[in-house]
Each structure stands twice: as C-alpha cells, then as structure tokens.
A protein has these predicted regions:
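A metal-dependent hydrolase metal-coordination microenvironment
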Residues: 1-86, 92-103, 108-128, 143, ...
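Short amphipathic alpha-helices and their capping/turn segments at secondary-structure boundaries
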Residues: 129-133
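C-terminal functional module detector
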Residues: 134-139, 144-263
Length: 263
C-alpha cells in the first residue's frame, strides 16, 4: 500500500485488532472488523472499527446476538474509535433496519472484495440514498476489505483533508466530513448560488444523485469531462456526486444537504 502512494492504512481483520504504528511518512491505524448474524432474514451486520485506543469489550455470545450491531458500534466508540457499517449491499441490509442503528460514523458505498471476480454486490449507493431520503444521512466511504490479494488490494480508499499525518488529525477530518471516497478520480465541489459545480481530473461521467426521481441535467458525459454543474431543485433534500473515468475507476462524494425538510 505504501508503494502505491497510500499515506495511511488500517488492517481490519475479523475479531483481531491490529495495532497503531507510525512510521516515516506512513501511518498504520488500529482497526478490526466485527460481525454478527448468520442469515439475511435475521440480519447480518459487519462493523469496522478504526482508530481504537484499546481493545473493544466485544466477544461472540448471547449479549452480542441480542443487541447485534448496536453493541458493536457502542463498544468501538467506548474504545475511542470510529464505527463504519461495512458492505451493506453484500450483507443484504435493508434501509429500514440500518436506520435503527445509532451513532454510525460512516457506511461503505463501495467495497472492493465484494465485487467480481471475488464476490458480488460491491455497491451500496441505493441503500445510502434510501436512508438519506428518510433523513438518515451517513458519510460515504470506500474500502478494499482485501481478502484474496489477487487484485482486491489498493483499489478503493478515502482522500482525507487532514492537517497532519496523525491518528487524531485523520479521525478529526473524517468526523468533520473532510474526505471523499475514490478509486482514482480527484475532485472538489463548489457551491454557487443554487448550483453545485464539480471540478475534477479528466473523467467520462459526472452524475448527481438526489431524492428526485427525474432531472434532465444530472449527468454530464463525454470523453474528457472536467466540470459539471447541477442546479438544485426546490424539492430536493440532498445531492451527492459520482464520477467515473475512462478505465472505470469511480469516486463518490458525501451528501450535500440542501436544508429542505424531509416530509
């Protein structure tokens, strides 16, 4: 990962917390992935903890089965970390169930190893949009979740606007929403009057997602797109952006909230 230009990383093995380590120009954050559930009818939840300062008080057993994902979220926070819902599409989580969870710090909109050829359902944007339309807005994250290391590594990541390369600065930036998820495209968003303007490295698509089912100017497509403009409609409560470059790499913004009430 360092050779591919990464500045920080978290090793999140199942039920094993990797320790934090600071090296020259590279930060390894503590991390682990916790899971509960055996079938989609009762619910399968995987929650990733990042930046914990001690081992979360979690173990498999009756208490976890009863309280499920909420207990994992709470214990990660008690240990000083942030809690991220992993691959909800892969887990077949329903928006109606996810919205009952309290204090999530983010949700994976894309999970590399959940995609072909290793698996299926890597993309969770529809679930995140359904939640946002109901007023439950989660930051959009991307991760490799690399299991095979046959191409599922160094693909999906966060671009974080942090003041320095340290645990506190990275976690603070994530908590404040100063990041976006990407597989390569870089971009920034400008608000001007009632419009959002996206500036990016060259891509083929810039698409605006909202809680409106129809808009005739939400997609800008071409061979070398570097800017797109979207005029926010009066009834829309959120806007988010997705980009795709010439080789299929994508990027995802967080949600921009318009201030309109969710009815």
């Amino acid at each position: 990962y360092r050779e591919e230009g990464y500045d920080f990383l978290a090793l999140t093995d199942h039920w094993f917390m990797g320790e934090e380590r600071q090296e020259e120009n590279f930060l390894l954050l503590s991390g682990a992935e916790y899971d509960v559930g055996n079938n989609v009818r009762d619910g399968i939840y995987h929650v990733v903890g990042i930046g914990m300062q001690k081992e979360p008080k979690l173990e498999k057993g009756p208490e976890l089965q009863e309280k499920q994902a909420q207990l994992m979220i709470d214990r990660i926070h008690e240990a000083g970390g942030i809690a991220i819902l992993a691959h909800p599409a892969w887990s077949m989580n329903r928006a109606s169930e996810v919205r009952l969870l309290k204090d999530l710090d983010g949700c994976e909109i894309y999970n590399t190893t959940s995609g072909v050829p290793w698996n299926c359902r890597p993309y969770s944007g529809i679930i995140l949009d359904e939640l946002a339309a109901q007023g439950y807005v989660l930051p959009c994250m991307a991760a490799d979740d690399a299991h095979q290391y046959t191409g599922d590594e160094t693909k999906s990541y966060l671009m974080v606007q942090a003041d320095e390369l340290s645990r506190d600065a990275i976690l603070e930036a994530i908590a404040q929403g100063r990041f976006y998820a990407s597989q390569g495209p870089r971009f920034w968003i400008e608000k001007k009057d009632n419009s959002l303007i996206v500036h990016s490295t060259p891509v083929k698509e810039i698409v605006f997602f909202t809680d409106a089912v129809w808009s005739d100017d939400r997609a800008t497509v071409g061979e070398c797109v570097e800017e797109a403009v979207y005029e926010i409609q009066p009834h829309e409560t959120f806007v988010r952006v997705e980009l795709k470059d010439a080789v299929g790499n994508r990027a995802w913004s967080n949600f921009y909230l318009t201030g309109k009430a969710v009815l």
